[in-house]
Amino acid sequence: MSLSKKLTLDKLDVRGKRVIMRVDFNVPMKKNQITNNQRIKASIPSIKYCLDNGAKAVVLMSHLGRPDGVPMPDKYSLAPVAVELKSLLGKDVLFLKDCVGAEVEKACANPAPGSVILLENLRFHVEEEGKGQDPSGKKIKAEPDKIEAFRASLSKLGDVYVNDAFGTAHRAHSSMVGVNLPHKASGFLMKKELDYFAKALENPVRPFLAILGGAKVADKIQLIKNMLDKVNEMIIGGGMAYTFLKVLNNMEIGASLFDEEGAKIVKDIMAKAQKNGVRITFPVDFVTGDKFDENAQVGKATVASGISPGWMGLDCGPESNKNHAQVVAQARLIVWNGPLGVFEWDAFAKGTKALMDEIVKATSKGCITVIGGGDTATCCAKWNTEDKVSHVSTGGGASLELLEGKILPGVEALSNM
């Protein structure tokens, strides 16, 4: 699956056509009020491009939350999004109370030129994800012929298809892979994601550094192994570092995270790194806490001293930060996935913050810096660095699966150039 050879919106002829666009409007809500409109704002360039280039209509579809195939308009309706979209676009948005069926097909068949239409939550139908639950909460699977009918109805709502929902690209859901139209392009958000991951995974500049944090080795095995085939350097930090250090250095790790499953493959990982000539940097000192709590008593430890019984490593220390700074300064391409400590708590955020500062500095000197989604993207938001790195991915799960070397169904379904 080549990321850089997929059809993109700027190469798609939209004039006079109805564009059906899969977007990610899965925004946080409180009492039916949107608390963060970032994802809606992010879709505006693709929508405006279609309107500015003479599209007859833009029909938008998205999921919101996890209604599991049960219509829950009181809790998971996209109606508030239509209101927000209207104010961001400065034009009317027609909101439909369903996403498939005769009435929806009729409304989208011959809309007034320049119309913007938002469909109701795709996940009110079990056929979107292929599984869900019935109103009583019992798990159910969608019937194949009903999935086919659902996809056929969606396919009638547009003449060309655009996918701008990278965050769901790792899911083979109906709206991602089942719209049957001859031209299927990535929107601008999706294109930016694919461009940056292509830079990292298909033709990287070197030295290439991967920084991998997070809690469990077992969760990151596939990621570590795939990246070891691509990078020159790797920093391993976060909770999973303690498993490596215990196995490799026989370090006393106190009550720190230890991953029994992951421990079994630490030596395999190190052998692969050695074979590929990849240098792995681990933390050498730690900020510790006497409990897993924001107000824990704070201590310090080194690999040599070990961590006292009952205490746990919750961040890396100042010597580790110096080592990280040296490794980052040499790189020309950096992919970072996973924080180095419990960054949500100030006492244990310094390691991740120091690394973020170095990444920002490297970016300003021309290094390409790609931040995987999830917690690392949250760090960028917390320290206001989203515009100071090359790219912050909008898809936690999707970016992780790409870095693991997996094929994303939502990307594979797009037309090739």
Swiss-Prot record:
Origin superkingdom: Eukaryota
Positions of post-translational Phosphotyrosine modification: Y196
Key words, A-Z: Acetylation, ATP-binding, Cytoplasm, Glycolysis, Kinase, Magnesium, Metal-binding, Nucleotide-binding, Phosphoprotein, Transferase
Pathway where it operates: Carbohydrate degradation; glycolysis; pyruvate from D-glyceraldehyde 3-phosphate: step 2/5
Intracellular or extracellular location(s): Cytoplasm
Binding site for ADP: G214, G238, F343
Residues noted as binding (2R)-3-phosphoglycerate in the record, renumbered to the chain: V23, D24, F25, N26, Q38, R39, S62, H63, G65, R66, L122, R123, H170, R171
Annotated ATP binding sites: A215, K220, G239, G313, E344, D375, T376
SUPFAM superfamilies for the chain: Phosphoglycerate kinase
GO biological processes: canonical glycolysis; flagellated sperm motility; gluconeogenesis; glycolytic process; phosphorylation
Sites bearing N-acetylserine, chain numbering: S2
Protein's job: Essential for sperm motility and male fertility. Not required for the completion of spermatogenesis.
Descriptive protein name: Phosphoglycerate kinase 2
Organism: Homo sapiens
